[in-house]
Amino acid sequence: MFLCRVPLSCKEPVKMYWNKSDTNHCTVVAVGFKEVGVDIEYMRYRRFEDISRRYFHKDEITDNMHTFYELWCKKEAYTKWKKGKIAKYMSQKIDKDMTQLVPQSRYQMTELDGLPYNIRGYLCY
């Protein structure tokens, strides 16, 4: 894979960050000048209540497909942004607006638009 066919010339090296996620024949690559984390998931029926009971905070247990994938994608994008372990952040409750996992962390969470109707995704930066 080439990002550029012509080598870039600059006096100082440019620090770039990237992250990728793929699901069901769909791939997203996020590139930026600071840390990024991205996650997309193909939404299909699962036993959401059982899965959320096992992995999410007790207040986040849900049987709703859209809520489940929203929480899952946000937590996974955040984990990738932090370069952390998924088990550590999946069980942490996110705030009312579902944007902040760890209050002292400074980041932004954005829902990805333009994805197929059955794929949900979030970008953390």
What label would you give each PLM region?
Residues 1-125:
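Conserved nucleotide-ligand handling architecture
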